[in-house]
């Protein structure tokens, strides 16, 4: 099944929304953990059960966030692949095709930053 450029751009835009929305809950979660740490309510002397809960919550939120982000990037790269097969594309289509390398970099950086944040949390607690 082949799609025209307009359909592919609509799919691209849907994936963009997913990439953004997939980060809302983890951002709120990390903000709450940071607020607890900054106010001294979450530190090395905090009850170990609460620390394990926070670590588990952040880890599971991170896994879901990374999974959603990588899936959206993969779907977006499929759109790029389909756009490249079209005989001609508009400036918008060309811009989307040009975004492919940045998406790959974004995916790699996102995984690294997520891992870094988790390691820092573990070290702090």
What are these regions (language model features)?
Residues 116-125:
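Juxtamembrane boundary at the C-terminal end of a transmembrane helix
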Residues 29-34, 108-115:
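Core segments of transmembrane alpha-helices
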Residues 14-29, 65-79, 99, 103:
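Charged, low-complexity, helix-prone segments enriched in Lys/Glu/Asp/Gln
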Residues 22-25, 49-63, 102-112:
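Alpha-helical transmembrane segments
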Residues 4, 8-15, 80-104:
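Short membrane-interface loop/juxtamembrane segments of multi-pass integral membrane proteins
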Residues 1-42:
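Cytosol/matrix-facing amphipathic helices and coiled-coil assembly/linker segments
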Residues 35-55, 91-103:
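Cytoplasmic juxtamembrane interface segments
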Residues 42-82:
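Short alpha-helical packing/oligomerization segments
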């Amino acid at each position: 099944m082949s799609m025209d450029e307009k359909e592919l751009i609509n799919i691209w835009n849907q994936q963009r929304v997913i990439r953004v929305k997939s980060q809302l809950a983890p951002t709120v979660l990390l903000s709450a953990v940071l607020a607890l740490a900054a106010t001294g309510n979450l530190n090395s002397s905090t009850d170990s059960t609460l620390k394990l809960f926070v670590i588990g919550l952040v880890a599971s939120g991170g896994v879901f966030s990374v999974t959603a982000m990588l899936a959206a990037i993969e779907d977006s790269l499929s759109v790029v692949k389909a756009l490249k097969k079209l005989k001609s594309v508009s400036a918008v289509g060309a811009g989307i095709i040009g975004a492919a390398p940045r998406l790959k970099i974004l995916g790699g950086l996102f995984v690294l930053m997520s891992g870094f944040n988790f390691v820092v949390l573990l070290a702090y607690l």
